[in-house]
Curated annotation (Swiss-Prot):
InterPro entries, alphabetized: Aldolase_TIM, Elp3/MiaA/NifB-like_rSAM, MoaA_arc, MoaA_twitch, MoCo_biosynth_MoaA/MoaC, rSAM
One Pfam family, short name: Radical_SAM
Positions that bind S-adenosyl-L-methionine: Y27, G65, S113
Keyword terms, alphabetized: 4Fe-4S, GTP-binding, Iron, Iron-sulfur, Lyase, Metal-binding, Molybdenum cofactor biosynthesis, Nucleotide-binding, S-adenosyl-L-methionine
Catalyzed reactions per annotation: GTP + AH2 + S-adenosyl-L-methionine = (8S)-3',8-cyclo-7,8-dihydroguanosine 5'-triphosphate + 5'-deoxyadenosine + L-methionine + A + H(+)
Annotated protein name in UniProt: Probable GTP 3',8-cyclase
Residue ranges occupied by any Radical SAM core domain in the UniProt entry: 5-227
Family indicated by similarity: Belongs to the radical SAM superfamily. MoaA family.
Binding-site residues, [4Fe-4S] cluster 1: C21, C25, C28
Top EC class for this record: lyase
Amino acid sequence: MLIDAYGRRISSLRISLTNRCNLKCIYCHNEGEEDSGSEITVEEVAQIARICARYGVDKIKFSGGEPLLRRDFDEILRALPPMRDVSVTTNGTLLAARAESLKESGLDRVNVSLDSMDRDRFTFITQCKGQFDKVLDGIDAALSVGLTPVKINMVYLKGINEDEVDRMIDYVRGKPLVLQIIELMNFHGAFKYHADVASLEQRIKEKADKAVCREMHRRTKYYLGGAEVEIVRPIDNSEFCMNCNRLRITSDYKLKPCLLKNDNLVSVRGLSDAEVEAVLIKTVGAREPFFKSETAKVCQPYKIYEP
């Protein structure tokens, strides 16, 4: 296992496969990445997954950009070592045609971005015409082949889709779908669309039949008459950092210890397995919460438990 100096065990990888996207969403921050022009290869994904698996990492999420733009995504999935959970976050526009093959290649589930059930609003948000029905078809395809639960990511946007929450809840009700209502983060001036989710969460809480708190994010899942709903707040808090168990890999094959920082990326491109392993151990050892207090630190060196 890999455990950093703050007692956080790394059990999950988040791998960005590309910076490219076929939509132009008005709020997109591309996970803080800059275009490098050199995408991570199948062999590189397999290498980092194989090495991390030796240390107890058993969960991988792929993201982008739009990861389904990678024509070799099926090959990437087949190159992975056994994992407890393999998922992808996608805009869904290319999912219908690929859902079955992705499932057969080892994908377990999908997150699909769907910010509006209104066609015109969807077009405004994505800045692309003719994509709305493709996303709905993609969700249906994911359900039909068992890429479940399908998580529906709805970014809550001021003056745009605030009135659609009930409609979205109705959409997921009674299906293996989970609605994630996401509070907008402040990236690249998009904060003009920010809408506070506090009052919304209180309203959902009052209607809920049951509420369950998830450990990592201290995020509550609400159950409302056959619908599952989560409120996802910006991760600018020490509680999220305290429970972070993820190591991120950029689309140009760099280790990214913290989602909110880009000044400590570590390239492992062109290295042997032994060299990558050594860099991985060192990177985890230097890993720190972005939001922290001095009293939060565990007074011991990082721990490496040999596989």
